[in-house]
Amino acid sequence: MSSRILLVYFTHTGMTGQIAKLIRRVTECDEEQIIPQVPYPEDVFKTIKQVRHDGPLYRPVINEFTHDVKKYGTVIIGTPVWTDGLPPPVLTFLEANDWRGVKIFPYFSTGGVYIDVYPALQSKCEGAAIANPLYLVYDLNGRFLDLRE
């Protein structure tokens, strides 16, 4: 197992992506962005409506990755929290990989409300050593409100 670090993130409004840029600058890690083949609406409320309509079992097609998570000792995963859970593109990514032996450091961004999605991440990454997550809470205007561990 390599000691290299891979940063994987999904962003919709840009907040999670901004955090990813900071992490990449500090760690000099490799980076992959999760991008759904069919983009979600830019309007957050339309996206929420679509996600609820699609249902909890929906998994969209996402971009192909150039990096293999198994070739990294550590993977940092960043994602927003959507409608009380992990976004469908993130679930597609998590379910497509073998996490045994990988160390995961997660961070979650959320729009104003703290929702614990850590158990959902744990259930999708069987065999990984998962660190306690960081929760970055923002309001809907992108103002930072709180940091929770």
For each feature predicted by the language model, list its residue ranges.
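Conserved beta-strand segments of alpha/beta enzyme cores
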Residues: 28-30, 129-132
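Redox-cofactor binding/interface segments in oxidoreductases and associated redox assembly factors
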Residues: 77-78, 106
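Short beta-alpha junction loops
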Residues: 108-113
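Active-site-adjacent betaalpha module
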Residues: 116-117
